[in-house]
Amino acid sequence: ELKTDDVEFYETYQQALVDAKRFPMSESAKRGRELFFSVRVNCSACHVGANLTDEKYHNLGVGIDKATPDEGRFAITKDRKDWGAFKTPTIRNVASSAPYMHDGSLKTLEDVVEHYNKGGVPNKNLSDKIKKLDLKNHEKTELVEFMKACTGSFPKVETARLPQ
């Protein structure tokens, strides 16, 4: 016997199936999705949840090698561990938001993937989630295709209901 909540969730699931048929992902993007969420590549350590962001601050080494590096969150908190840390952006609609990173230093999604592939820019506060990836060229392309596929309307995220 289905409860009212079950029916609502089932209807949401059914709509997701319809949307998947209307807006199918390429096989390359699907492989990119598998990489994105894999333990090996680990993009989902920071790009997680419905909006693909953990809303936290991380040091990726972006701009750290410049003559006057941006202090990042440290400028606000004055906590040394926040030096060079910036808030994780969403991956949603990322294909429409170039240039990338807080300083606009990476012009294309391919540049972004290559930055992570190299393990960021080494520095004492580099996030422990950033590691050299050693991706093959086709894997880089697949990751970019997945990120491009994340373009569209934002998901409707309803607040959880407490049991009555």
Each language-model region and where it sits:
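Short glycine/threonine-rich turn/loop motifs
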Residues: 9-107, 111-123, 158-164
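Residue microenvironments linked to proteolytic maturation
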Residues: 1-11
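Short, charged low-complexity linker/loop segments at the C-terminal edge of domains
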Residues: 7, 151-158
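Generic low-polarity alpha-helical segments
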Residues: 1-3, 32-35, 146
